[in-house]
Amino acid sequence: MQETSEEPIEKLPDLDSSLFEKFLPDKIGLEPDADIYMNFMKAHECYDAIPTSSKLVVFDTTLQVKKAFLAMVANGVRAAPLWNNKEQRFVGMLTITDFINILHRFYTSPMVQIYELENHRIETWREIYLQGSFKKLVSISPNDSLFDAVYSLIQNKIHRLPVIDPVSGNVLYILTHKRILKYFHLFASKLPKPSFMKKTLQELGIGTYKDVALIEETSSVYEALGVFVARRVSALPVVNNLGKVVNLYSRFDAINLAAQQAYNNLDVSIMDSLQQRWHCFENVLKCYAHETLEVIIERLVEHEVLMPASIPERQWATRERADPGFVECKWTSREEGNESMK
C-alpha cells in the first residue's frame, strides 16, 4: 500500500504542438463538432492520466469484511482491488457499494448485531452476493487509450477501472470518470471547441428530469440505503417537508458509518446522521438546466466533484410532484457490473 496522496495535475505536460494539429478541422476534414474529443482520447494512453504519486490499497480475499471497510475509510479510498492468493490473480473490486449492500441485506434492528459484517471474510461475501456467477475482473492496460477506458466504464456500467500492468500483473492505478475528465480538461483549451459545449443541459438532454431519486430528511438511514440499492445512484438530494433541497446524502456518507461504528443503528434519521458527518462538507453544489455544458464541466473540475448535482430553480409545490426546474445530473454511470465485487 502506497501511503502518499494523489498528486494533482497542475500544469500541461510538455508536448509537441504537432500533437494538436491532426485534430484541427481542416486536417481531418470535419467540423469541430465531429469526433474531436473522441480522437483526442484515442491519441492518449491510460498511462498518461496516471498521477506520479497516488494511494492504492489492495485486499486479500481472506481479510474480514469489517477490517477491509475500516481500512478503506482510514486511507480515504472508495474502492480496492481484491487479490486471491490461491489463484494468484486479482479477482474483483471491493467498493462502497458492497458495504451498502451488506448493511441493507443483513440489518434487522439496533438490538441485533450484523454478524455478516463483523465476521465474514471478503471471499464469503463474494460467494453470497455473486452466488457462483463470478465474472472476470474488468481491467485495462496502461498502454490502452483513454477512449478504450471511457468505453469500458460506460459499457460495463462501472465507476472504477483498474489499470493493470500486463507484464508484472500489478495494479498501477484505479482510473475513474473524474480523473479522465480532469486530465482531458487540461487540454480542452488547446482543441477546437464543439458547438455542443455551448448548448444547455436541457438542450442536450443531460440529467434526470422525471422520477428523481431523493430522500426526506426525516427518513431513516436504512431507507436511504434501500434507495441506493434500488436506484443505483451515487447520491441522494435530501429534502425537507416543503420539498426543498437542504443537503446531499452520498454513498461516501454510508461508508463513514463504519468509521463511526454507527452501522448497528440504521434507524436514525438522515438529518441526525448528517449532523454527525465528520468530514468537511460545503453547501450542495448546484447546476441549472439553462447552464451550458462548458460551464458545468468547469464547475465540476474546479470543485473536484463527480456526483449528482441538485438543481432547484424553484421550490417544489408538493413532495409528490417535482417542479420542472429541478434536475438531477448524473455524471457517472450507474454502479453495477464489477463495480461491486465482480
Which residue stretches match the model-derived regions?
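Tandem CBS (Cystathionine beta-synthase) repeat/Bateman regulatory domains
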Residues: 1-342
